[in-house]
């Protein structure tokens, strides 16, 4: 399954529990090199980027996405 398909599946099939899902990305500015982004922060996804709801209009390239997890039970939904 492609990243875009996994993101869209969660956004549409689990929208009532969207806060329970996070996207883990590579982030060079953090100490451990990883950053968690809640699905509630996600505005859109296309074939190349994730677009976040923010004043800075943050755009994240999909090649930085490592995995998608469910927080409640730490289940791995998708992994590169």
UniProtKB/Swiss-Prot annotation:
The lineage of its organism: Archaea, Thermoproteota, Thermoprotei, Sulfolobales, Sulfolobaceae. It holds the Pfam family MJ1316. It comes from the Archaea. It comes from Saccharolobus islandicus (strain L.S.2.15 / Lassen #1) (Sulfolobus islandicus). This is UPF0248 protein LS215_2790. Belongs to the UPF0248 family. InterPro entries: MJ1316, UPF0248.
């Amino acid at each position: 399954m492609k990243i875009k398909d996994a993101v869209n599946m969660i956004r549409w099939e689990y929208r009532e529990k969207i806060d329970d899902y996070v996207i883990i990305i590579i982030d060079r500015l953090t100490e451990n090199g990883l950053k968690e982004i809640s699905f509630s922060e996600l505005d859109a996804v296309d074939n190349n980027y994730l677009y976040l709801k923010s004043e800075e209009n943050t755009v994240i390239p999909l090649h930085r996405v490592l995995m998608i997890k469910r927080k409640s039970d730490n289940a791995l939904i998708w992994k590169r």
